[in-house]
Design a protein with these regions (language model features):
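Conserved Walker B
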Residues: 82, 203-204
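N-terminal "arm"/small-domain region of PLP-dependent enzymes with the aminotransferase-like
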Residues: 1-56
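Conserved core of the PLP fold type I
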Residues: 46-198
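Short, solvent-exposed loop/turn segments at secondary-structure junctions
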Residues: 23-27, 31, 113-114, 165-168, ...
């Protein structure tokens, strides 16, 4: 999407194209800007907070805030822990490397952030896709189910990346009904204990 936008800018002119593909704010002259409140807070931090190394796992207060933001009042009863990574891309990279096997396939939808494929290739994995939407533009649980069945027939574990809410690039968010169906498929494969499924929910947006 970013490359296509840049091509459109070259073809039609920067004054006629708005680039909304990159997560950065530019002014009218194309220069990077920062939200004033964010800049004010960053500049007010003492040097030891701004420049010192944090613990490898992350600052305890930050980790607790992450769990509260992610789950709010719906924290699961099971094991729950947070780990800091070098940005959202770092979290995806760590998950691919640690929760899938070299040579195996990782599953996501056919509309996806291109970096997923790059991260899989760098880690020696293959990115496979299912059709995100059916003919009525609803979540395509049939395609999801078929692809999960096919991949788990050939491998013992499967990492599934689901980008929701506000899926990039479609903006789609899975409904509670969609989630129930996705989890039913995963539970069916995992109940025997011979297959392992890891769900990576990319909540970047």
């Amino acid at each position: 999407a970013s490359a296509a936008c840049n091509e459109a800018i070259q073809k039609y002119g920067a004054d006629k194209v708005t680039n909304g593909t990159i997560g950065a704010i530019m002014d009218d002259e194309g220069k990077l800007i920062c939200i004033p409140t964010v800049e004010k807070v960053l500049r007010s931090l003492p040097t030891n907070e701004l420049a010192a190394y944090a613990p490898i796992i992350g600052l305890p207060a930050y980790l607790e805030a992450v769990k509260n933001l992610t789950f709010a009042d719906n924290k699961p009863d099971g094991y729950l822990e947070a780990v800091a990574t070098a940005g959202g891309t770092g979290a995806i990279h760590n998950t691919i490397w640690n929760y899938s096997e070299i040579g195996d396939s990782v599953l996501t939808s056919d509309w996806y952030w291109g970096t997923y494929n790059v991260l899989c290739q760098e880690a020696g994995r293959k990115l496979e896709t299912y059709e995100l939407f059916d003919e009525n533009m609803n979540y395509n649980i049939e395609s999801f189910t078929d692809k999960v069945n096919t991949l788990l027939a050939d491998q013992d574990s499967l990492l599934i990346i689901i980008n929701t809410p506000a899926h990039n690039p479609t903006g789609y968010s899975l409904s509670e009904e969609d989630w129930d169906k996705v989890l039913d498929v995963c539970k069916e494969h995992a109940k025997g204990g011979n297959k392992k499924i890891t769900l990576l929910v990319d909540i970047a947006y």
